[in-house]
């Protein structure tokens, strides 16, 4: 409710001992939810601070860019039966599909496979672009997400966590590209996977219309050496027209 207030307090200046509150300083007791314990917490308070809306932020696990690291690519259906393609994470939460750079820019990995071998590859070049247009950097296909503000860095960025925020330009571009003001109702096609290159195909460039719940998607399929090339930046298979509503 609008009239509710939250506070963070400090207390318990004396050591934890088995003869008083139980446990020890290195292994404090598990908090108990009862009236006696609640009263004790109030009695031991030394100071408190009111928490304003600007003192709270949504955070995610911090994943710092390190040159030469192989990151996962984003997949919406990561599970025990479909593990992440590099880290073998079994959930999106544990997948390493994003990272923060030395300039506090955050990027999402849309594709991490080598266009020649189809295997995962390390990312050596630190990206710097801030355009909402997706770009290839060091063989990775990346989406710029946002840059942390000075305030967010000083208040919420730690060794373990980083703020999850929104860049209005990026979100507006995503909504526009989806053809809908609610981008989660559908989106353009950014990436596709070649699960098998096959063999014996006539060399050349071909185009295939994407069948599905969206419209306008067209794939450019390049055959070289009588095999379908993997998705990549240039001279290989790629998305000719992203379409919308998928």
Where are these regions (language model features)?
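Tryptophan-rich substrate-binding surfaces of secreted polymer-degrading and adhesive proteins
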Residues: 1-183
């Amino acid at each position: 409710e609008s009239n509710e207030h939250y506070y963070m307090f400090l207390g318990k200046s004396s050591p934890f001992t088995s003869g008083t509150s139980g446990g020890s300083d290195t292994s404090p007791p598990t908090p108990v939810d009862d009236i006696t314990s609640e009263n004790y917490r109030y009695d031991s308070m030394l100071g408190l601070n009111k928490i304003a809306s600007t003192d709270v932020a949504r955070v995610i696990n911090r994943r710092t860019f390190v040159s030469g690291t192989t990151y996962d690519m984003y997949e919406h259906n990561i599970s025990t039966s479909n593990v992440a393609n590099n880290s073998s994470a079994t959930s999106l939460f544990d997948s390493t599909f994003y990272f923060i750079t030395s300039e506090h820019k955050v990027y999402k990995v849309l594709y991490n496979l080598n266009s020649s071998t189809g295997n995962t590859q390390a990312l050596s070049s630190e990206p710097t672009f801030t355009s909402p247009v997706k770009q290839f950097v060091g063989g990775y296909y990346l989406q710029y997400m946002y840059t942390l503000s000075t305030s967010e860095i000083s208040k919420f960025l730690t060794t373990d966590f980083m703020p999850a925020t929104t860049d209005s330009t990026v979100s507006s571009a995503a909504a526009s590209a989806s053809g809908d003001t609610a981008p989660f109702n559908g989106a353009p096609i950014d990436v596709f996977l070649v699960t098998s290159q096959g063999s014996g195909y006539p060399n050349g460039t071909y185009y295939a219309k994407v069948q599905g719940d969206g419209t306008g998607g067209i794939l450019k399929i390049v055959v070289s050496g009588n095999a379908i090339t993997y998705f990549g930046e240039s001279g290989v298979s790629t998305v000719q027209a992203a379409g919308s509503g998928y």
